[in-house]
Amino acid sequence: MRLHAPLGFALLIAMTSLTAAGDDKDKAIKEDRKKYEGTWQVVSLEVNGNKSAEEDAKKITVVNEADGKWAIEVEGKVVARGTSEIDPTKKPKTVDLTMTEGEDKGKTSLGIYEFGEDSRKVCLAPAGKARPAEFSSTAANGHVLAVLKRMKK
């Protein structure tokens, strides 16, 4: 019977550690959601390794809401909407974008992201493909690599 007490104590410690880790992840998600929130202008865009002209990239804005909803606008017209799931505890940080409106409705793209000062970099794989491991876009990997700057209100 004495063996049960140490085992129970070990389980209690393990459960407490898992809860603390979950709390840390929730806190990190909340912090990054706050960073994501707002309107962002694309300043650099590469698709399949092809860099878009700066003036074309700057026609695109992304509006992120605190709850993870987002919209992509081109010259002020919404071309896609969706939801996002982020995990800022991963290295690199991960994002899953699910399209709810637009050409790719119902599809999910896996990606990675990082923040700079008033900027963020995102690299996304085509829907159904593996998550990028690094921030790169080539003809072979088919990734979209974008740098966005926060727009001032």
Language-model segments: what does each one mean?
Residues 1-153:
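Low-complexity, Gly/Pro
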